[in-house]
Structures are given as structure tokens and as C-alpha cells.
Amino acid sequence: MEDKKIRVAITHGDTNGIGYEVILKAFDDPTMLELCTPIIYGSPKVAAYHRKALSMETQFSIIDKAEDARDGRLNLLTTFDEEVKVEFGVPSEESDAAARKAVARAKEDLQKGLYDVLVQAPMRSGANPAKEDKSLTMMVCDHVRVGLVTTHLPIKDVPQAVTVEKIVDKGRIFQASLKRDFRISNPRLAVLALNPQLGTEEEKVIAPAIEELEKQGVQAFGPYIADDFFGQQMYYNFDGVMAMFDDQGIVPFKTLANEYGVKLKAGISAICTTPDHGPAFDIAGKGVADEQSLRHAIYMAIDMLRHRMDYDAPLVNPLPKLYHEKREDGEKARFAVRPIQKKSTPEEGGEMEEA
């Protein structure tokens, strides 16, 4: 890996959105080609249409297979030959299909090991249906990393879906990703409460899940009321935040990320990132889209790959272990919060229960 540039596959996203605009803008900077070798999975005809409509001059080299990608060039791999009608700002079945074809071809090449990491330009969520699995949806920006315990559920169905087992599973995935993908040696997780006020779910589900995570070696704290947690900027004290459902994590995250957030799936072998915004149909074709979120998605994918290589290196030829690790109990005492316990804290004149 060190002898060659990292190959970054980038799917073109919704052809009626800002995908090509942010891709062309990002690689109009020559330093990007020094960082990696990009392979755009899309359509030369659609790319040329966008480039002309936006009066851009970014050059790309057309290839038919990923093996032909060359360093120092913006390689554009033809994923389909059909004509695609481009209507800026108009979501359509045709643009959805074009997005799906690019993703499908990229996934095929990923299985063959033809590139290193995958970045997806914005597309409608319906064009790439999500499914419940053993992964964790994460959103990352400079200030906070948020993991979602449940996704794509009506709010009325969330309480039943939030279980001790699910919180523990997602918490373990979160911890593993923070260690391997972000190189945080001893990550601390804040777990949000489900309700605006602590109630049944917090006492019977979330608190027991936190205790189980602790038993399994995960530093987990909470439950915290979401409004208080974000309003008081408590996220600065933690390496990750576990939200119980979409809006609980997405709404404050988007405010903090300011359109520069990145979304990824933790707990899977592949590295796949995407800007944390949609196709932005309202500004498509106007030349005003900001490419920084796509840049951040590319940077993060590359960093994750490097972090994994660094993390995995000692595991290839491990040295004999001559000592035993000791947990840092002091960290637990510092951040432990048990709002559902009835015992008073030292500040209230009582004794704090040991964490």
C-alpha cells in the first residue's frame, strides 16, 4: 500500500443532483490527485453534460475497467451506456436507476479488490434502500461522532425496537470502530436517554444496557437527556454519542456539522463514506454547491484505511505478551452519571455509589 497511491472509488450519485458538480470541483484541485487515485463510477456523457452546464474545465480520463485507472488522473469508469436525461433539480426514476447502477458496479469491483475505499456522492435514500444489519450508522464531524441505535423507523415504533441487546451490540461496534478506524485507544461513549424525561425505558432498558457494556469492557456513560446533553455541549467530553433514533442524533449533528458532516457504516469490512447531505436538488445545476463535504468524505475514507493498517500491523506478527493490561478506573469515576439512582452525590452531602 505504501508503494502505490490509495485508490478511491467514487459513485456519481443522483444524476439530477449536485454529485458531478462536487466531484469535479473537488478534483479541480491538483493536490487531490497527489493524495489518491480516484475512479469515478458513472457516465462520461452525463459527466460531460454537467461539466458544460457548469462551465467547468476539469478534465477526466475515460476507462472501461478499474484496472485501467492511472495515477495523476481523474479516471471516469463507464458503468452504463444508456442515454440518461439530465433534468437539474428533478428527482426521477431514471436518475435513481443511474445512481443504483454506479453503486452496483462499484460493489462488484470492491469484492474483486480493485480499489481500496468507496465514497458515494449524494443520492436519494430510496434509491439505495437501507436494511437492518449488524452494522452501525455513524455521522462524524470535527466536534462529535454520533452512532444510531435504530434507523428508518416511525417514532411510535422506536421504544419497542430499543432493547438491551441492540444497545449492547451497537455499543460494541461503536467502540471497535473508534479504536480501529479512528485510533482512539480507550474510547468513552455517551448513551442518550430515549425520552425527554427519564422514565421506564431508561430504567429497564438503557441503564441495564450500559451496565452490560461496562462488563464487556466498553466505557459507557449515561443515560443523558438529549436536549441537555447537546445544549450543554457535553459531547466534548466523549469520543462518541449513541442516539436511540434518527432525529435524536441527526438534528443536533447537522447543526454542529454545518453541512460538512460525513456518514459511514461501522462494523463492516469495507470502508464506505458519503457526505451527510442529499442530492440538494434545490441548487443543482446552479454552480453554487460546496464540495467540502465530499472532500471530507474522501479524507475520512483514506484516514480510516491508514488507521486500520496501523491498528492491524501488530496483529500480523504479535510479540509474546509479558504483562497484563489494567483498566483505567479513574476515567469511569470521572464521567459516570447515574441520574436514575436515588443516592445523593457528594455535592448534595451524600456518598456517591462507586461506578
Indicate residue ranges for each PLM-predicted region.
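Anion-binding alpha/beta catalytic cores of soluble intermediary-metabolism enzymes, centered on
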Residues: 1-355
